[in-house]
From Swiss-Prot:
Record's keyword terms, sorted: Cytoplasm, Endonuclease, Hydrolase, Magnesium, Metal-binding, Nuclease
Xref: Gene3D superfamilies: Ribonuclease H-like superfamily/Ribonuclease H
Amino acids binding Mg(2+) 1: D12, E50, D72
Organism: Dechloromonas aromatica (strain RCB)
Cofactor binding note: Binds 1 Mg(2+) ion per subunit. May bind a second metal ion at a regulatory site, or after substrate binding.
Single GO MF annotation: RNA-DNA hybrid ribonuclease activity
Positions with a binding annotation for Mg(2+) 2: D12, D136
Protein name: Ribonuclease H
C-alpha cells in the first residue's frame, strides 16, 4: 500500500452541555487531497458526536481502503478495539447485562469499519495536534450552524 492509497482520518466531537447541542468534525486526507466534514445535532451527547464523526468520515470513503483514523476519544478507542467484540457476542448487552449505550451508532460504525482496513490511533485532545485542533474547530462549527 503506497501513501497515495492510504487514507488519514482525524475526528472529533463536541457538546455544549452533556446532553445538549453537539457537533462533529472530520478531516480526510488521501495523498494531496483533503476533505472536511462537519455537522450537528440539537440534543445529543459528547460520546454520540465522537462516534458520529468517525461514522460520517468512514462513510465518505468511496471505496475500500487502508489507513489510520485518529481520535481523542478513549470511549471510541476502547469501544472499537476492545468492548465491541463482547457486546456483539452478548447481543449488544454489557457484561452486566445492560443495553449498550449508543448501540445504534456502534452498530453503524461496526458495519463501516468492516469495509476498510483501518488502524485506530488515540491522540491527546487539546494538546496542539494540528489536525485534532482542526477537527475540534469543525465540530464546534457544527454546533454554531445549529443556531443559524
Amino acid at each position: 500500500m503506497t501513501a497515495e492509497e492510504t487514507v488519514e482520518i482525524f475526528t472529533d466531537g463536541a457538546c455544549k452541555g452533556n446532553p445538549g447541542p453537539g457537533g462533529w468534525g472530520a478531516i480526510l486526507r488521501l495523498g494531496p487531497h483533503e476533505k472536511e466534514l462537519w455537522g450537528g445535532e440539537k440534543e445529543t451527547t459528547n460520546n454520540r458526536m465522537e462516534l458520529t464523526a468517525a461514522i460520517r468520515a468512514i462513510e465518505a470513503l468511496k471505496r475500500p481502503i487502508g489507513g489510520k483514523i485518529y481520535t481523542d476519544s478513549q470511549y471510541v478507542m476502547k469501544g472499537i478495539n476492545e468492548w465491541i467484540h463482547g457486546w456483539k457476542k452478548n447481543g449488544w448487552k454489557t457484561s452486566d447485562k445492560k443495553p449498550v449505550k449508543n448501540a445504534d451508532l456502534w452498530q453503524l460504525l461496526d458495519a463501516q469499519v468492516k469495509l476498510h482496513k483501518l488502524e485506530w490511533i488515540w491522540v491527546r485532545g487539546h494538546s496542539g495536534h494540528p489536525e485534532n485542533e482542526r477537527a475540534d474547530a469543525l465540530a464546534n462549527r457544527g454546533i454554531e450552524e445549529l443556531k443559524g
